[in-house]
Amino acid sequence: GGEFYHFGTSHELLSSMLSIQNIVNDQREIMHHDRKPHPSIFVQNTELKPKWTQQNRNEWVENAYVGENWTLTQDNIVTGVPENDWTLTLSEGQCVDIVPIGAESWAVRPYGFNDKFRGDLADVEYLGRPFAEWAAERGIDLNAIEGRHDLQAARIFPIVDNTDDMGIVLRWMLGESTLAEGKAIWEKAKRMSADEISAEANLRRLVDQRTKLRLKNLPMIAKNWQHSVFYQSDLQTVAREYGKYDVALPNALPESASLLTRTCDAMFRSEAERQRTNGGTQSSEQAKKYEAAAFSLLREGLTTEALRVKQRPQLSVYADQIVWGRSPVRIDIAGGWTDTPPFCLMEGGNVVNLAINLNGQPPLQTYVKPCAEPHIILRSIDLGASEVITTYEELSAYNTVGSPFSIPKAALSLAGFLPRFCKDSYRSLEEQLRAFGCGIEVTLLSAIPAGSGLGTSSLLASTVLGALSDFCGLGWDKTEIGHRTLVLEQLLTTGGGWQDQYGGLLPGIKLLQTERGFSQSPDVRYLPGDLFQQPAYRECHLLYYTGITRTAKTILAEIVRRMFLNEHDELLQLREMKAHALEMFDAIQRLDFERMGRLVGKTWQQNQLLDAGTNPPAVEALTKQIDDLCLGYKLPG
C-alpha cells in the first residue's frame, strides 16, 4: 500500500519531510555521512552563511540567501529571499517568504510557524501573537486594513522594489516595532494579501533565482560528496544542468573513494560533457574517455576477487579421453535487467527464469580433448571455423565482439593459460603446454543463433568454463562457474548480468535473488514445473524464432549508463521489475496459469519501457496477429 504525507501547514511541511527522510534507516543504503546537528534541518537551493548549531531544529530554507549576520533559532521557514546584507534575527516560530511580483518588485510576507491564516483580524493570530496586539504595537488601525474580515485576504504585505527597503520593513514587521523607517516604508508601499500574492507571483523570476542558487550549490555539494547526497541524486538531471550552464566539473575523486562512487562519478562526468551545448569535438572525446573509465572501473570491481585467485591448470584426463560439456539455454519471464550491474550491485536483483532444452537435447555443447602438439586448436561446428593458437599474444586477443572464438580464448585465459591468471610463470604458451602435458583442442557447438535472447553467449561461456574446469582439474562448482562467466563477459567488454548463466547452469524453473554488493551469488528458490509440463498446459507454451537478432552489447551500454546516473525513471522501473518477479514467483507457486500468463505480458510491457528498441516494427507486426489468442508473450532476454 501507499503512504500519504500532508504538506498543508508549516508544521506538516517539516514533519512530512522528516518522515520521508527517515523511511530508510539502514546506514548501508545511505552512502553519505550527514553532518546536520539535527535531523529536522532542510536546506535546498540556498546560499547559507551562518553555521547550524545544536539549538537549531525544525528549519526549512529554500531558494534563499541567508547572510552572515542572520540568526536563525527554531521553527523557522525562509523562502525566496534574494541576495542581501541584512542583520536579521528570526525568533522561534518566525518565518519569511519573499515573492517576486512583476518585473522588478517583491512582496514581503513574514508569518508565524503556527499561523492558520483564517479569521477576522480582531480575532486571529499573526506571527504567533494576536494580530490586534501586533497592529496596536505598530500604530496600525485595523479598520483601515482592506480585507480585514480574513487574514488570508487582508492587504498587509508590502511591495518593495529594492532589498534595502525589504530588510528594513522586515525588521519592523518581525520585531523592531519602533523602527520608524520600517513603518514609513510599509505605509507608503502598495500592499497585497496572501491570496493576491499567490495570484500575482512572477514564477519565472522565482525559478530563475532558484536555478542560479542551485548552480552555486552543485559544485559545493559535489566537493562535499562524502557528507552530501550528490552521488545518490539523479545524476542524469545534474549532468544536464552542468552541461546546459557550462558548470566546471568537480575535482577528481580520491582513490580512497569506493569503487561504485568512482564509477558513478566517471559516468556523471561523461554525461556532463555530452550535454555541453558548446563543447564540440573536445567535449565529445572527453565524454567517451570518461564513459570508458566508468566501464573499466565496473570491470575492475567485478573481476578483482576472481583474478586475485590465480589458477594452476593440471591435466586431469587420459590421452584418449574427451570432456563433453552440455547446457540448456534459458528464458526469463520476470525481473530480467535487475541482474545487471551496477543496479544489482546497489540494490540486488530478482529474476524468474527457466532452463530449456530444444528437441529434448541441450543446444549448447563443448568438447575438450588433448592433442599431441603444444598448441591450442579452436573449432566451431556450427560456424565451420577453426583457429590455431601458438602464443600468449594470440590467446589474449579475446576482447573483440563478433570474433568466433572470443569466448573460448577468454575461458582458457581464466583457466590459467595466460600469465596474469596463472600461479606459475612460463616464458611462452608452448612451454606451458609442454609442462601441462599436451596441447588442447576445444570444439564448440551452438544449435541456437547468437542474438536470440536465450542467453546463448553467456551459457556457451559457462559450458566452456565447466568443461575446462574438469579437463584442467580446477574444481569449480556451478556457483564459481557462474561468477567466472560474469568475469569473462567483463573481459570481453560485453557486460551483462548473472541471470543468463545461472538460468542454464541450474535446472528447471526458479527465482534467483541477490543482495547488494560485488559478490553476486544468487540464492535459488525452485518452483514446480506443473504449469509447463502437465498435459493440460504443455501445449499452451510456444517458443517462436522470429529470425530477428540483436547484439546485447549496445543495448546494455545505454541501459547501464542510465543505471550509473541514477536516472529516476529507470531506477523506478527496475524496482518495479524486482517486485514483479516476486509476483511471478507467487503465481507459479500457486499454479495459477492465467495469472502467470498475464504477468508475462506485463514483463513485456516493462521491458519496452526500459528499452524502446525491444519491440521493433517487424516483431510488433507478428504479435498483433496473436493478441487475442494469448494471455501474454515476450521476447526473451
Segments from the language model and where they lie:
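DPxDG-like acidic metal-binding loop motif
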Residues: 452-474
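Contiguous, small/hydrophobic- and glycine-enriched helical/loop subdomains that border
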Residues: 470-488
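Catalytic-loop motifs flanking and including active-site residues across diverse enzymes
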Residues: 12, 403-410, 456, 460-464, ...
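Left-handed beta-helix
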Residues: 1-278
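Short, conserved phosphate/pyrophosphate- and ester-handling motifs at nucleotide-, phospho-/glycolipid
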Residues: 9, 457, 637
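Glycine/charged-rich beta-loop-alpha catalytic/anionic-binding loops adjacent to active sites
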Residues: 389-396, 438-450
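Short pre-catalytic strand/loop immediately N-terminal to key active-site residues, enriched for Gly-Thr
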Residues: 448-452, 631-633
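C-terminal nucleotide
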Residues: 175-179, 183-434, 483-493, 501-635
